[in-house]
Design a protein with these regions (language model features):
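N-terminal signal-anchor transmembrane alpha helix
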Residues: 8-33
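Transmembrane alpha-helical segments that form the membrane-embedded catalytic/substrate-channel core
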Residues: 19-27, 93-103, 178-188
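Short, non-helical or kinked segments that cap or interrupt transmembrane helices
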Residues: 36-46, 104-117, 144-150
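Interfacial segments of multi-pass membrane proteins
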Residues: 51-54, 77-80, 113-142, 155-163
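Loop-to-transmembrane alpha-helix initiation sites
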Residues: 145-152, 164-176
Length: 218
């Protein structure tokens, strides 16, 4: 039986990505403080909830870590398997899925924004800057952070396809769009109810808590 080498390399890339994605600093920070971050605040073990619960420094650390882990997974897979034309895309997608659905945390993970940013950064600084610009415009217009990963998970794969001509890789990247949307259904419901946090919480946390009707937990 002949073994398909590229298939094995893609599988290895997926394993690297998923294992890296499961590393969750927000959850660890919560444990060190004596609580499960998935049961406090928004319930999301990611940067935004860490900012709400522990402040900007902790939240920015979580964001930087999550961006970095995706960038490392993509870069490492591309370096290890240069002849596999979808190694980076497979690793990046698996990292996002590992972050959102980590086996180590009962498949209850984050929502993928920072990891999406990290995989894009690993492919190209130009791609990252372009997506950052357009998503910043969206964020300024709507003020809802949750809309960024939803649109990014659709927009970047299309952009990547036109930029590289690697539509197979783009299809792999685009496969996270539905899981990302599913992760944000509750956010969309809260937008409709006027209870979703806006980016304003970065400088007006108390105002956002009052506006949304959330109670800050001790």
């Amino acid at each position: 039986m002949k073994i398909n080498k590229k298939l094995l390399q893609a599988a290895a890339s997926a394993a690297i990505g998923y294992a890296t994605g499961m590393l969750n600093p927000a959850y660890v920070i919560g444990l060190r403080k004596g609580y499960d971050i998935r049961k406090k605040g928004s319930g999301n073990p990611g940067a935004s909830n860490t900012i709400i619960l522990e402040g900007k420094k902790a939240g920015l650390f979580v964001m930087a870590f999550d961006i970095s882990k995706a960038a490392v997974a993509v870069s490492l897979s591309r370096r290890l398997f240069p002849k596999c034309d979808c190694a980076g895309e497979t690793a990046g997608t698996a990292c996002v899925l590992g972050h959102m659905f980590p086996a180590t945390l009962g498949f209850r993970g984050g929502k993928g924004l920072a990891c999406l940013g990290g995989e894009i950064l690993a492919f190209s600084l130009h791609d990252f800057a372009t997506m950052l610009f357009f998503e910043s415009v969206l964020l300024m217009a709507t003020r809802y952070i949750c809309l960024v990963p939803i649109t990014l998970s659709v927009a970047y794969p299309i952009y990547h396809g036109f930029e590289t001509g690697n539509w197979k890789g783009s299809a792999i990247l685009g496969s996270v769009a539905l899981p990302v949307l599913a992760k944000h259904i509750e956010n969309l419901k809260r937008i409709a109810e006027g209870k979703e946090f806006k980016i304003d919480f970065l400088w007006d946390k108390e105002g956002e808590l009052e506006r949304t009707g959330w109670e800050e937990e001790e």
